[in-house]
A protein has these predicted regions:
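Bacterial Sec-dependent N-terminal signal peptides
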Residues: 1-25
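Short, 15-30-residue, compositionally biased linear elements
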Residues: 153-168
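Anionic, Ser/Thr-rich low-complexity intrinsically disordered regions
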Residues: 133, 138, 159, 202-204, ...
Length: 209
């Protein structure tokens, strides 16, 4: 019995050591991701050359972060017992990757949202974004995009809610993932960016081409 207890203790210590190692690695990933995006806060004051320089560096950091995070996910799956910051790092790296990777790891984000490791809104946003980039209607109404709209008999580009698969059930679906009613969301988002966001229920995906 003592032998088995020692084996169990060894396994627990090894697991904790592995968890701590992942936390250190992933928390560094999070910090690097955020640092690489600091420049976007003052982007309006930068020259074109400076924007190119910062963008290139951000892409380099993203590439390194993706190699780290996706290497862990592909080899070990999503590690358990991570810190909130480490879990957030995985989500951010997936979110900042291209469509192929977002689609690949979407099921993991859904699993972790259902487990409470991530917010359900994280899954809703990623799911809608993937569907939009695949040319499909979104589910939760989190994505907006520019589209040609008739304004005062003229055609103008307008920020619009990307088409929704089931408009009648939208608010109900949003509530299941902790999102506010769509009209409230559109109002606050419009005020935040200083530009009206329109939901034209007649628009289809084809209208955004």
């Amino acid at each position: 019995m003592l032998r088995y207890s020692r084996v169990l203790l060894f396994l627990i210590i090894a697991a904790l050591s592995s968890c701590n190692q992942y936390n250190r690695i992933l928390e560094d990933v999070y910090d690097n991701d955020q640092a690489a995006r600091e420049w976007t806060k003052w982007m309006s004051s930068l020259s074109a050359d400076e924007i190119v320089e910062y963008s290139t560096e951000m892409e380099r950091v993203d590439s390194l972060n993706q190699a780290t995070v996706f290497g862990i996910l592909d080899k070990e799956g999503w590690p358990s017992h991570l810190s909130d910051k480490a879990n957030r790092a995985i989500w951010i790296v997936i979110d900042h990757s291209d469509l192929a990777y977002r689609s690949k790891y979407l099921y993991l984000v859904k699993e972790k949202a259902e487990e409470g490791v991530l917010d359900k809104t994280d899954y809703a946003i990623l799911n809608d974004r993937v569907r939009m980039e695949e040319g499909k209607p979104q589910i939760y109404g989190t994505q907006i995009k520019m589209a040609a709209t008739i304004v005062d008999d003229d055609i103008a580009m307008q920020l619009c809610l990307w088409p929704v698969e089931n408009p009648a059930a939208l608010d109900s679906l949003r509530s299941t993932v902790g999102l506010s009613p769509i009209e409230e969301y559109l109002k606050t988002s419009s005020e935040s960016i200083g530009q009206e966001i329109v939901w034209d229920k007649e628009k289809t995906v084809a209208d955004f081409d």
